[in-house]
Design a protein with these regions (language model features):
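Glycine-/small-residue-rich active-site loops that bind phosphorylated ligands and cofactors
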Residues: 774
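Membrane-proximal interfacial segments on either side of biological membranes
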Residues: 1-83, 94-160, 169-534, 548-763, ...
Length: 875
């Protein structure tokens, strides 16, 4: 009898070597024997008990068996030449309760017959504990029948019959396994030959019955990656030296191992971080070192109600001998884009892809070919697997996919791998055609977007960049930047080719026709609901602008800073703008030189009411020199304006024009109706008219003009113009009218004492009425229209030669009624019409009226009456 003796000590004392195995078990034993006088044991009975310990393969730590308790009882009967050993072994929840018999037939020298059967009528002989997965339920074998032959002379062990089965009231839980084989020690190396066949059984049962020492790495991979379903057929055969089946043994020859397994309804998870393939039909073929798993069909349920179909799958380990063994898999995926979007949003792909698509807002179908490479190892390192997915998307659409906009495509190509992904093709972004190339590399937080598109007026409105009539035409753009769920602060780099478009005061005073080269580059950043354009650079058509600008979610300007603001060659300006807490935009412009010609012209011609929103504004301009038309300049311009609620609250302007003549403006109240007006005055009206290119042939003149301020409603602006002591030079028609006056010969121009006219300004137009010009040699009446949009003047009236004498009759009430044309028209006059551009109108006269008295002339139509497009101003 012995108690708690280490098997290690027993083996060491007996000088026995178990090779690579280390047995660490505390052993207790008791033996009772009857010995014949000849010293031959007649009866031997006893018990061997092993308490908790381990049996470990020193060369491969994965082959490890924990023994909780083992109890062997034995009884040798020499007369019957029979050894009976009932035993029970408990290991990790598994339990083996059987009875082994060993008989030595007298007629067969050196032969022992081994039989293993059920050892207890109540306890199942083999009970296998559940696996780590919830799908791997435990299993019990209730029938065991093993017959084996040990031939010591031939050094051979043969399993003639090995039947393990379970008969259950549930047909799906019935199973049976048949084993035959031999182990031959006669040669230089032990040689094993075996065959295993199984009936239909659950996959979980096969996994639980798989011995821990057989194909350890493959067993570990199957344990983690395959579950559920049924094994329809299993046949395993081997015939090779025993060393070939060891973990560290030589490669298995091609005819040394054959495995044939067919399953249905199986769940396969090739990569642990991706959803499993369910309802799969698998066929496993292993020949020698080559293992191939074919998948006929299956589905991937990425989220409730969203599935992808899997077909044509192949999982192959070309050589199972290297450790770890390298495997590859390929299969085809078909399904809806919403399911694919849910897959991309899964934990295994979200960080790799970097872009999350809402499955609820995506549409289309996807067909993809997937290739996977992995190392069969346990534990599986994070970098032990890689994949490549080539996908074709059709009828694709996804809301807010790029730049917060909807993306649509009839076809789209996508390539994804464990190193990153790429999406490339022709799409529509919020309805705008574009070409995209979207890429993301492993380890990067966001994807990089390369996009080309042509943005027309409709597209700009859809993108919330409605520029009105300031930009007409389509703009080719190139966009490079980072997009994704973790968008960094790098922003989007945009390059816009402005050559094909017409620009009209996109920036104050910048006018560019179609075809003249210009480009803009900037970096667009979205911060919350605001959009900021940094590193803004505009070049072309004389413009050079550098700075930054920011807009809020309503496309309202928040701030702007342009340290370089040159809209024409030679401009030297800076501009800053910011919106205060009261919502008013504060704009400050400073500089030495500014070419104001385009600004003046476009301001007069503006008709875009949508662009003319009268927002709250504080304007502060200080410019050394403002260049105008016809060589005239404003110098020392200092202008301050404040507007609230669409109404101008304060206005003040000081400057000099001509030969240092002041040109000033402010707000005043008109006495007759107590109405606020904008008031300008200067002693050089001619210089101002030349500066604005309204009429370059006027010289001198003390002028004041009063007009209604602009309003939020774009109401017509009524005003009055008054000029005294001025001259008109270089006007041939006027000089012909006065050529007959005494002393008129050789004069350089025509002098006038005063001019007064009422006008009404509309967007892009002006209507003149009740205009009267008086002078010593000639007078005139003026009425008509000026269309700045079409650059067209259409004025008409009457020249009255010798105004002072000729109009004398008109001032006499009775005589003037019959002979005169009224208190402001002469007895004799010449009707005229001025048409053409404002800066150079063409004046024509009607000589017939020169000989007719005023009463008769009223029945002779002026030239303008015959113009079907002429619309007299409203009086």
């Amino acid at each position: 009898e012995a108690r708690q003796v280490s098997i290690r000590d027993i083996l060491l004392a007996a000088r026995l070597n178990l090779g690579n195995f280390d047995v660490d078990l505390p052993l207790s034993a008791s033996v009772r024997a009857e010995i014949s006088p000849e010293g031959i044991p007649q009866l031997v009975q006893g018990q061997v008990v092993a308490d908790a310990g381990t049996i470990v393969d020193r060369e491969y730590e994965k082959v490890s068996l924990n023994i909780d308790h083992a109890d062997f009882r034995f009884n040798w009967d020499a007369r019957r030449h029979s050894l009976i050993v009932p035993f029970q072994v408990q290991s990790g929840g598994n339990q083996f309760t059987m009875r082994a018999t060993l008989d030595a037939p007298p007629e067969q020298d050196g032969v022992w017959l081994l039989g293993v059967t059920r050892g207890d009528s109540v306890i199942d002989p083999i009970i296998i504990a559940p696996g780590a997965s919830s799908d791997d339920e435990g299993i019990a074998i209730n029938r065991v029948a093993v017959r084996a032959r040990i031939d010591t002379n031939r050094k051979r062990f043969e399993i003639e019959q090995g039947d393990l089965s379970r008969v259950d009231t549930r047909p799906s839980h019935n199973l049976g396994i048949a084993v035959t084989g031999s182990l031959d020690f006669a040669g230089a190396e032990p040689h094993a030959a075996f065959g295993v066949a199984g009936t239909r059984m659950p996959v979980s049962a096969l996994k639980r019955l798989w011995p821990i020492f057989a194909a350890v790495d493959v067993r570990s991979w199957v344990e983690e990656h395959i579950s559920g379903g049924m094994v329809e057929r299993v046949v395993v055969a081997g015939n090779a030296p025993l060393e070939d089946f060891k973990h560290n043994g030589p490669p298995t020859p091609e005819d040394g191992l054959s495995v044939d397994i067919e399953t249905s309804g199986t769940t396969l998870r090739p990569i642990a971080s991706l959803p499993a393939i369910r309802d799969a039909d698998l066929t496993v073929r292993i020949t020698g070192r080559n293992a191939v798993v074919n998948l006929g069909r299956g589905t991937v349920e990425v989220s409730p109600g969203r599935k992808l179909s899997i077909a044509g799958g192949v999982f192959e380990v070309a050589d199972t001998h290297p450790k770890p063994a390298l495997a590859r898999a390929s299969f085809r995926i078909d399904g809806g884009v919403p399911a694919a979007a849910a897959l991309l949003a899964s934990d295994g792909l979200r960080d790799t892809v970097g872009i999350t698509l809402d499955p609820a807002s995506t549409r289309g179908t996807v067909a993809a070919q997937v290739a996977v490479k992995l190392a069969i190892a346990r534990p599986m390192p994070e970098d032990a697997s890689s994949y490549v997915i080539n996908a074709d998307l059709t009828s694709f659409s996804a809301d807010k996919m790029l730049l917060g906009q909807k993306v649509e495509a009839s076809t789209l190509k996508a390539v994804a791998s464990s190193d990153g992904f790429q999406i490339k093709g022709d799409v529509k972004i919020n309805g705008t055609p574009a070409t995209i190339d979207l890429r993301k590399q492993k380890g990067e937080a966001d994807a990089e977007l390369h996009m080309q598109a042509t943005i027309d007026e409709a597209a700009r409105r859809r993108f919330g960049m409605d520029l009105g009539s300031t930009v007409t035409g389509a703009i080719p753009i190139k966009v490079v930047g980072r997009v994704g769920d973790n968008v960094s602060d790098d922003g989007m780099s945009v390059e816009a080719d402005l050559t094909p478009v017409k620009i009209d005061n996109l920036l104050p005073g910048w006018v560019k026709p179609v075809g003249r080269p210009a480009r803009a580059t900037y970096t667009m950043l979205k911060t919350g609901k605001a959009v900021r354009f940094d590193d803004l650079s505009v070049d072309g058509s004389g413009a050079t602008v550098r700075g930054s600008v920011e807009f809020d979610s309503a496309n309202e300007l928040v701030s702007a800073n342009f340290p370089v603001f040159a809209l024409s060659d030679g401009d030297k300006l800076t501009l800053k703008a910011d919106r205060g807490t009261d919502g008013a935009l504060r704009v400050a412009m400073r500089g030495d030189i500014y070419d104001g010609r385009n600004f003046v012209k476009s301001t007069l011609a503006s008709t875009d009411k949508a662009r003319q929103k009268q927002e709250d504004l504080d304007l502060d301009l200080k410019v050394g020199t403002v260049a105008g038309h016809n060589g005239e300049t404003l110098r020392g311009l200092d202008l301050k304006l404040s507007r609230r609620g669409g109404r101008i609250r304060t206005f003040n302007m000081t400057s000099k024009i001509g030969r240092d003549t002041p040109l000033n403006g402010d707000l005043r109240v008109r006495a007759r109706d107590n109405h606020q007006v904008i008031y300008f005055e200067t002693d050089d009206a001619g210089a101002l008219f030349r500066f604005t290119d309204m009429y370059p042939r006027m010289f001198g003149g003390q002028m004041w003009v009063a007009m209604d301020p602009p309003t939020q409603e774009q109401s017509p602006q009524v005003g009055t113009l008054f000029i005294r002591s001025f001259a008109v030079r270089g006007e041939p028609a006027l000089e012909r009218v006065v050529s007959g006056a005494p002393g008129a010969a050789g004069i350089a121009g025509v002098d006038f004492s005063e001019m007064r006219a009422d006008f009404t300004r509309f967007p892009g137009k002006m209507a003149v009425r009740d205009g009267v010009v008086r002078g010593p040699l000639v007078g005139a009446t003026v009425e008509g229209n000026i269309d700045y949009t079409r650059d067209d003047v259409h004025l008409r009236g009457t020249f009255v030669p010798f105004y002072g004498l000729n109009n004398m009759f008109g001032q006499i009430p009775i005589v003037g009624l019959f002979l005169g044309g009224g208190s402001k028209e002469g007895l004799v006059g010449i009707t005229y019409e001025a048409v053409g551009p404002p800066g150079a109108p063409r004046i024509t006269v009607n000589p017939v009226s020169a000989i007719a008295p005023g009463l008769l002339r009223k029945f002779i139509p002026s030239p303008g009456t015959f113009d079907p497009n002429f619309l007299p101003p409203t009086r």
